[in-house]
């Protein structure tokens, strides 16, 4: 499932993150690439664990912790600390798949990459190109979202970023280990939770159908969750 999550950051929060990022030193994006990705990747990136990356990343993690749609869709168990990249002057990232396991440098913190996330930090009208293109059974899905919006998609997906030919595309990217590793199971739970929330708004939390469906949701989560 590929999902657009609007307004993860407010415009004010985006501006605060950009103040941090624009004052930072950027390095070759291949610092975090696997062997396959390094062949296709051309961009700039904030060094992993740098003060700027930590400060902006903490702001994003705080926002995610308050985002009900993110929790419903991802069912996060672990979130890899957000990283940041910048594409300009023809930079692009060819078709690749993300590594299955991400290790935080200098620690024993590991994340199985069930989901990938890209949080846009530049308005789409300020640059040309830079679309995130995610492939699945049904074709290629493109994302170029307003600043503060995020796209969430299975980390097993082939994907690429088209060349940026004007301006600069700035974004955060990171990976999530879900409590439910299977994408189809996780999608079913998200769809069920969405309908439960709709019925709750219509009928109230004491309605018998709401209570029954909530029980089914939690029993499925109990069956499928790793946690």
Curated annotation (Swiss-Prot):
Instruction: Say which domain of life the source belongs to.
Output: Bacteria
The residues listed in the UniProt record as binding Fe cation, with positions renumbered to this chain, are: 96, 98, 159
Q: How are cofactors bound according to the entry's free-text note?
A: Binds 1 Fe(2+) ion per subunit.
Binding-site residues for 2-oxoglutarate, renumbered to this chain:
169
Q: Which cofactor does it need?
A: Fe(2+); L-ascorbate
UniProt keyword annotations, A-Z: Dioxygenase, Iron, Metal-binding, Oxidoreductase, Vitamin C
Q: Which SUPFAM superfamilies match?
A: Clavaminate synthase-like
Q: Which organism is it from?
A: Burkholderia pseudomallei (strain K96243)
Could you tell me the Gene Ontology terms of the biological process aspect for this record? DNA damage response; intracellular iron ion homeostasis
Q: Which residues form a coiled coil?
A: none
Q: Where does the Fe2OG dioxygenase domain lie?
A: 78-178
Gene Ontology MF: a single term? 2-oxoglutarate-dependent dioxygenase activity
Under which main EC class is this enzyme filed?
Answer: oxidoreductase
Gene3D superfamilies to which the protein is assigned, alphabetical: q2cbj1_9rhob like domain, Rabenosyn, Rab binding domain
Entry EC number(s)? 1.14.11.-
Q: What is the protein's name according to its record? A: PKHD-type hydroxylase BPSS1206
């Amino acid at each position: 499932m590929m999902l657009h999550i609007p307004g993860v950051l407010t415009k004010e929060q985006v501006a605060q993150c950009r103040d941090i990022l624009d004052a930072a030193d950027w390095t070759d994006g291949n610092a975090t690439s696997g062997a396959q990705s390094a062949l296709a990747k051309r961009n700039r990136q904030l060094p992993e664990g740098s003060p700027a990356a930590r400060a902006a990343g903490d702001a994003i993690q705080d926002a995610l912790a308050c985002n009900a749609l993110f929790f419903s869709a991802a069912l996060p168990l672990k979130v890899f600390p957000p990283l940041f990249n910048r594409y300009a002057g023809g930079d692009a990232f060819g078709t690749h798949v993300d590594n299955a396991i991400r290790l935080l440098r200098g620690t024993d913190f590991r994340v199985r990459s069930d989901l990938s996330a890209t949080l846009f930090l530049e308005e789409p009208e300020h640059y040309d190109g830079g679309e995130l293109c995610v492939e699945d059974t049904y074709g290629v899905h493109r994302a170029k979202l307003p600043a503060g919006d995020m796209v969430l998609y299975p980390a097993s997906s082939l994907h690429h970023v088209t060349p940026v030919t004007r301006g600069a595309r700035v974004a955060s990217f990171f990976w999530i280990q879900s409590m439910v590793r299977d994408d189809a199971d996780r999608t079913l739970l998200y769809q069920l939770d969405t309908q439960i929330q709709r019925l709750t708004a219509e009928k109230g939390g004491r309605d018998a159908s709401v209570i029954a469906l909530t029980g089914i949701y939690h029993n499925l989560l109990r069956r499928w969750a790793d946690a």
